[in-house]
Amino acid sequence: LVGSCMRSGSLSLEPYLEVIDNWAIEYTRDESGKVSFFDLSHFDTLPSGRAYRGNTLASPMMLWEGLTQLIGEESLERLIEAHTRWLEERLRSSEYIGYIGVDLFLYREKGQLCLHPCVEINLRTTMGVLAHFAYEQYVPEGKTGIFRLERGRGSATGERVIPLLLTGEDSRFTAFVELDK
């Protein structure tokens, strides 16, 4: 720990939080600098919480209903407005055009469910955006599934598992869509 601090020149301490659920709000930023809501993303991490495991594939309405059941529709709408204003202001002098993902999570503190409204901000096409397009492309209406990545060439099997591209000998990851029954 000391060696790592010496190399980086800094130390960051954060409280341990009992994370219950991971979400992201996806936005787009256009040429004029306007930031607009794109979609919600519900994702899972490895038990350590440090690595991505996969995204829920569901309609935008199902994702909206899932998160509003936990935090309320008014809270979600206010959060989207706050993110939008903050992102437009902070990116005013930026030339960035594209997707913006704001990760958030629900955690339990003293028995109460709480929302961390901004864990990190990603200025790129996020896994949530890819999951959105995978849902549109591969999931039949009314169905749900999981979008996931696996290290290595992968071995998609079964009629409910769809590899998203052919993998070559040098592939390091494989993307899959797995449909729920």
Where do the PLM segments sit?
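A long amphipathic alpha-helix within ATP-dependent nucleotide-binding catalytic cores
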Residues: 4-15, 50-113, 150-153, 158, ...
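Phosphate-binding site of ATP-dependent enzymes
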Residues: 1-52, 105-118
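Active-site lining segments that contact anionic ligands and/or coordinate catalytic metals
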Residues: 22, 97-101, 114-118, 170-174
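Short beta-strand element of the conserved SAM-dependent methyltransferase core
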Residues: 104, 121, 176-180
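ATP-dependent carboxylate/phosphate-activation module, predominantly the ATP-grasp catalytic core
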Residues: 27-85, 122-150
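Peripheral (often C-terminal) accessory segments that flank ATP-dependent C-N-forming ligase machineries
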Residues: 140-181
